[in-house]
Amino acid sequence: MSGRVCLECGSPHPGAGDFCADGCRTAFNNRRKARGAELYDLFMAHRFDRTRARQLRVLQAMNRLASNWRAEDHERRGSRRSWRLPQDVLETRPYLRAIVTIDRTGRRAQR
């Protein structure tokens, strides 16, 4: 058996994936969904309502959420990570790496 461990329950498993069973994958993704819902509004304010976000210290709040979630991972999940690897996210969404430029006429172009 390889040294792979399920990201959710911590059980060793022989597969190539990150989870030993569908239930573990579902629990992992449900936790990501709930945490993401908490983070979404704060991030959008941080990005698009910068003045108010600074006044309310939104970036500090987002960092506190992440720290609390990581502490929860250490406490309840044997320190296993609770996020997808950045390269996996970017691999499935190549448009996130695109560079958008605007020419003199105001047209957008992607490289």
Where are these regions (language model features)?
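BZIP DNA-binding basic region
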Residues: 1-34
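Long, charged interaction segments in nuclear RNA/chromatin-associated proteins
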Residues: 32-111
